[in-house]
Amino acid sequence: MKHRTFFSLCAKFGCLLALGACSPKIVDAGTATVPHTLSTLKTADNRPASVYLKKDKPTLIKFWASWCPLCLSELGQAEKWAQDAKFSSANLITVASPGFLHEKKDGEFQKWYAGLNYPKLPVVTDNGGTIAQNLNISVYPSWALIGKDGDVQRIVKGSINEAQALALIRNPNADLGSLKHSFYKPDTQKKDSAIMNTRTIYLAGGCFWGLEAYFQRIDGVVDAVSGYANGNTENPSYEDVSYRHTGHAETVKVTYDADKLSLDDILQYYFRVVDPTSLNKQGNDTGTQYRSGVYYTDPAEKAVIAAALKREQQKYQLPLVVENEPLKNFYDAEEYHQDYLIKNPNGYCHIDIRKADEPLPGKTKAAPQGKGFDAATYKKPSDAELKRTLTEEQYQVTQNSATEYAFSHEYDHLFKPGIYVDVVSGEPLFSSADKYDSGCGWPSFTRPIDAKSVTEHDDFSFNMRRTEVRSRAADSHLGHVFPDGPRDKGGLRYCINGASLKFIPLEQMDAAGYGALKGEVK
């Protein structure tokens, strides 16, 4: 697999195809010039970045932005790591990109950061975000591991904990998914997370690159790993599976939160992106390794899969050829296959992964069913009830003012007609008629349905003055309101955590008790 040279003055970028990978899609590779390297940049306090870059060490970079509350909450942690002897085997720096991806302009950012108190945190400023753009960084926080020779070895999008960071430095191919990841909440002491009720199913449906990326986007999916299943040999390589007739199928191991998704839900998502009538072929990929199949480890799941197949058969005249079999074996694919479309955004993908952002028919996945709120009075349940019925993320966001990852929630991309209610109490808050794509990474609205349904509070954290927004009835933390919204609609942007909301589709509003508000949607 080719690596991208980072410390050179010029690097070429494009579709990076691993040896013997899934059938390639022809794309224009193109080129991109990197006018500045890390060593030529300066830090926020005007020091040469080269001070922090020793050539005989790999470099672990954290990309962050001033508008990302999660990033801000982790600055102290990053400063601690930068001084910790455990991280001495690598250069550890952070990069901010003034003028890129909604970041403040250079002078404004410098002035803002000067008011913070992280004297030992290396913050390199890359004006215009050249480095972030060339590495396809579009989500904050994100991490990149650069080898001693300047090769990009790994890109991780999202927050990582100390154990994951150290594992990454020791081994760029480390399985970060096997390490504990705690949800971080700002300005409060971290508490232990509840044990998640997870289950696993194994899905084969053509090239695993696309299927893995697709399931990773689905709310409630904990992990998706590419591998080889139900073959005749042990520990096969990609070349074995492709050319030596081992009988394995390219398969994605999907681990999901059973309190948020059922197996039938997973199968509905699966059938959205595979042709169940195509024998040994999906997209451009042909061969028995590209067959379709659902492989289970719990015999009770066979009937659930059979029922889903029977339902799906009604949509087709041709017979379905999807296998419904017990899992005989599964072996993780090589590291270069894992997260392939994150490492190589222009790589081949035979499915439309955006379908992961579309809720299932009749489903509103942000909140478990049967939450038990009082729709008439919008009462807040007890804390014990909230811990039982909300997900860990929903609880931390609404009760402890935590912040979900930017661009992580399905509601950021949802624009179907309906209303958004408080996930805690059910109180109506926002309408789809007032929702717009602000590009900030969180669901954005120009106004609440009723101005009295939200309360505003001064928030002076992180050397900024912001206006926090909370729900009236349950006092749930929702997000913040900013004066940079569409001028023709009042000029406000309500930037709201998707985890604080529950979406009620227009066609379900009557049954859910919100029929009187349908006029706010139409």
From Swiss-Prot:
CC annotations in GO: cytoplasm
Pfam families: PMSR, Redoxin, SelR
EC number: 1.8.4.11, 1.8.4.12
GO biological process, one term: cellular response to oxidative stress
Catalytic activity: L-methionyl-[protein] + [thioredoxin]-disulfide + H2O = L-methionyl-(S)-S-oxide-[protein] + [thioredoxin]-dithiol; [thioredoxin]-disulfide + L-methionine + H2O = L-methionine (S)-S-oxide + [thioredoxin]-dithiol; L-methionyl-[protein] + [thioredoxin]-disulfide + H2O = L-methionyl-(R)-S-oxide-[protein] + [thioredoxin]-dithiol
Keywords, ordered alphabetically: Disulfide bond, Electron transport, Multifunctional enzyme, Oxidoreductase, Redox-active center, Transport
Domain text: Possesses 2 methionine sulfoxide reductase domains (A/MsrA and B/MsrB) and 1 N-terminal thioredoxin domain. The domain B exhibits a thioredoxin dependent methionine sulfoxide reductase activity; the Cys-495 is probably involved in the reduction of MetSO and in formation of the sulfenic acid derivative. The regeneration of Cys-495 is probably done via formation of a disulfide bond with Cys-440 followed by its reduction by thioredoxin.
Free-text function comment from the UniProt entry: Has an important function as a repair enzyme for proteins that have been inactivated by oxidation. Catalyzes the reversible oxidation-reduction of methionine sulfoxide in proteins to methionine.
Annotated protein name in UniProt: Peptide methionine sulfoxide reductase MsrA/MsrB
Protein's gene: msrAB
